[in-house]
């Protein structure tokens, strides 16, 4: 899956 940069902080 691919997520937004903000969710990559998790």
From Swiss-Prot:
Gene Ontology MF terms: metal ion binding; oxygen carrier activity
Tissue and organ expression note: Red blood cells.
Subunit and partners: Heterotetramer of two alpha chains and two beta chains.
Role according to the record: Involved in oxygen transport from the lung to the various peripheral tissues.
Name this polypeptide is given: Hemoglobin subunit beta-2
Keyword Heme: yes
Alphabetical UniProt keywords: Heme, Iron, Metal-binding, Oxygen transport, Transport
Similarity comment: family membership: Belongs to the globin family.
Disulfide bonds: none
């Amino acid at each position: 899956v691919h997520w937004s940069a903000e969710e990559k902080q998790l």
